[in-house]
Amino acid sequence: MDFQAEKQLVLDFYAALDRPQASEAALGQYLAPDFTWRGYHPFNEIRDLGQLASTVWDPIKTSLTSLQRRMDIFFAGRNSLTDSADGSTWVVSMGHLMGLFDQPFLGIRPTRRITMLPYCEFLRIEGGRITEIAFYFDLPSLMDQAGQNPFPPQTGAQMIQPGPQGQGGLLLDSNPAEEGEATLAAINAMIADLGQWQSGLPLEEELARTWHDDMLWWGPTGIGATFTIERYAKQHSGPFRAAFADRAKTNHICRLAEGHFGGFFGWPNFTARHVGGFMGLPGSDTMLEFRVIDLYRREGDKLAENWIFIDMLHVLKQQGMDVLARLETL
């Protein structure tokens, strides 16, 4: 199946949106009147063009001047979780919004230096219009680059997420359907093994079923990146599972793949109860929501790389810590 028209529509949308002082006009040209936009805290859900322009895109472009969109991954496909007869296609984009951090943004003090805001976006296309967007972004990464990291030391390494090994993530041309099917099968197998953390297998053995030994896990600020199954188990997956109980089943809005790339997002993806230890925080009886985007690169029949976006500010706010409000006092 060919998704070239939908890809071109999103590329045209980006070209219009990324121009200075053209936010509402660009949004109105490409978004359907009844669109839904989802973004991380403090933006959450937006369904009004003027609000989306004035609260999200105008402030971003005011704060990050000379803005450039630097994409590392770009692909499209049908949502595997819905009936193919719904007529919609999803386009996925991941990379960084790069600019000069010249004005404050959400209380983050500017540096007047180059900065890169990691983002990932799922866009649903129906009838030549964008009807739904999930725009997830690593706002704590912007804080860290500005010397205002609000988190305690993290278990993984802090860095700007790179694109995929081999730099082949921009799928601007059509790809064989069987490659996307193989990628989706690998992702589904990983999700099935993950389950509710009750596989009964030792963690590293469980991971080795669907991951290459030299896997790369590009985690968000607050958790960090890890390399190899052994270090991923020790530096993220093991500590994370130990810090939570009563994990709900996975709940995705969209899951798709094209070529060697695929991914999913939820709102939320799952809930779990924090028993203590995550990011050095004490436990609580609250069931926490996790809003997540995961993108993957497949090699052979296993997964090789994973880019993860988690709404860390929303997770902490559910535990009584408003990071943005606290930032204003520092």
What kind of region is each of these model predictions?
Residues 1-330:
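C-terminal and inter-domain tail/linker signature
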